[in-house]
Amino acid sequence: MRKMILILLVLVAAGLLTKYVITKIHRFYTLDDLQTSWPQQVLGVYNRSTNSIIFNNDSVLHYTLNWVNNAEKSLPEKSIKLLIEQKLPIFFNLQIWSGKLISKLDKPVLNAIVTGDFDTKLIAFFKLLDKSKTTIYLRCNAEMEMPLYNKYPWQNQGATLYIISFRHVALLCKKYSPSVKIVWGPSGYPGSEEYWPGNEYVDINSVNIDTAKEIKNDPYPSYSSVEEMTRLKLFRMRFMNKPVYFLSSASVTRASFKNQWLNELNNKLIADKNIYQSTIIPFESDTTAIKKIRDTNLEIGVYDPRLKLINQPLITIEHIFTDMKSVENGLFKKQFNAVIDRKHDVIVTIEPWKDNSKERDSAILNNTVLGKYDKIWSKLYQEISNIPQTVYLRWGHEMEIPVDRYPWQKQDPVSYIKAFRYFATFQKATNIKIVWGPAGDRGSVEWWPGEDVVDFVSIAIYGLPDKNINDYNKQQSFTSIFQNKFHRLRFAHRPIFITEFGVKGPEDYKMKWLKDAAETINKYPEIKGVCYFNFADTPKAWGNAETPDWSITPLTFKSFTALLNDLPKTNAQ
């Protein structure tokens, strides 16, 4: 063994081994790897107080410190001491690679951090940094949100576990080295917001300008240029009241990055200031920002075009899907009046197109802002206003899903927000509640239009996770789906209305799934109402897969509603 290691060390000295093998040797000796060359350097800084970006000309020393176990003795203490004696600011990129624990069983690295297995080493490191007389920036376990990259062991571990581990490290750092600037370092990929650890644990945000990784992961929305990438990454950081550092990469170096790109982005920031930086965005949002509303009765409803369930006594609301053509030709008014005659409240999902099979207006968002459909919106608002019933008006739903089902999908989030705000403020009556309706998928909060134009957030919960799964036994539980979507929407700061939900399978399986749903609904006072989708999904919406039928029997629905708390008193009597 000693002979083999000596041979490897000779090869390393000769430069004949890759960095991968070098890392393996370090791991065998339980030594940490301090890299003095790092491609990620600060290109520019976004200042939220001035809503502007400046190009960074400051000299900052960048180092990556790779930890391969939790042994304090493996810290390169002498090297770190020499570094922090320098006058220039230092940016440490700490990567805790391994859950290899001395005298203990190995465990996943984030779990090892949370359970304190790295505490002794972390404290020793922070005590070293506390002796520095220069500014120290510390970024730990970055790029956590990249879904397909799989380079680091802290990726694809779940947002909650990552947040807990980040907070653990941050609290130790603040205790033993309070002057260190803690950097939260997502790549800036869609869904970054899910991993936000909280305002009090972070001093600075950073995002990577890296075309190679983004293209590999097929980001949505897609990027047409480095400038576009930079803009969207900054847009995803708009909920956090922190400066944003743009970091270079091997594919976008400091030498290749142009100041002009930042200047152009500055112009866009000024033009769209009310979207990028708004006083109504709850910057301090953490994990419990969604408002609780269950001081009133739970709304119970159905989408039930075959009229199988609508006469059940606990139902207070019905769901109508409509489009611009139906508003124009009077079909919507007929459907709407039928619900009003039944004394039910109404969810109106308005799909901003005229013919979902022939006419697809790819410029639907821009045309909305330009006023092309004003006559239609005026007619719609006139028909639903000033009536005793509450109307929950939901426009352009499921905008964040990267498919071609609707022409308002796969669009720039800023364009969507402008169109949504135009529609939401077009006209308002006291009986109308504006509903923002994402599916609740990854990155959905990017399309958040602002709480000044939204009364409720709606989500859809269906058991089948995607169109490639037809086995009803492989469906996800209502609870697991809801908890993921609830977490993603924590920045929205509005109560939840589950305007669509459904399950596939035999009736006994459906009842079991719905029992779990009732338990979760009862636990969350943030949920204003629920509406079951009692019909088959849209034909061909699932591609070549069999279209799922979510329909349930009246007995199953009655059994489900009997499990709910805060039932409507008037209808239940």
List the model feature ranges, each with a label:
Residues G44-N51, E72-K81, L122-F125, P186-E200, ...:
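Alpha-helical scaffolding within the catalytic cores
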Residues Q41, N241-P305, T390-H397, F497-Q573:
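Substrate-binding cleft of secreted/luminal carbohydrate-active enzymes
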Residues K73-V180, K334-K433:
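Substrate-binding cleft of extracellular glycoside hydrolase catalytic domains
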Residues I25-T120, S206, S251, Q277-I280, ...:
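N-terminal substrate-binding region of glycoside hydrolase catalytic domains
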